[in-house]
Amino acid sequence: NKHYFRASDIPYFNRYRDLLDDVLRSGDFNPIFDIFRLYRLRAQQNLDYAIAMLDEPIDFTTNKEYLFNRTELPWLSSPEEMQQLWRERVTNDALNLSLADKDWDGIIKVLTKRYKRVLKRINQLDSDDVVETFLNSFTRTLDPHSSYLSPRQSEEYKIQMSLSYQGIGASLKLDDELVAVLNIIP
């Protein structure tokens, strides 16, 4: 993802290019974990920078363009270029909220919460999640209807298919750190 990785990261990834099929055969997922660790590091760096940017008011009077889809663009080559990209992204996010009639304090609150939530989700991913993502990426190249279920997902699937789930009968939603009851299930 060109919002996280830089050109200098590509040689690091290339050393694993010919090993990915070996990972599938051997079950040694260390190369995948190495790649994920770099992703987690880059996400932490960029999102920390984005949150820190909110300490200062953003100038909406500049005439700049933000390109979210960067697939056709070259990889950024330096931390400074990555910070510039994130400045543009945060400015774009803040501008969208401003256009939705949020005041500056509201913008800070929403964006801080958003960026921290992304970081929290990335940091909550465990080795099973990383393996599941990798294996699903592989299986979908062969068949879009095939997927790998991690042990946790497999257990949830078994419960759903057996219709034997026993619990409090409520549909729950995680809202920030609080659990909210959406509805009671008869």
Give names to the regions the model predicted.
Residues 1-186:
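Flexible, low-complexity junctional segments that flank or bridge functional domains
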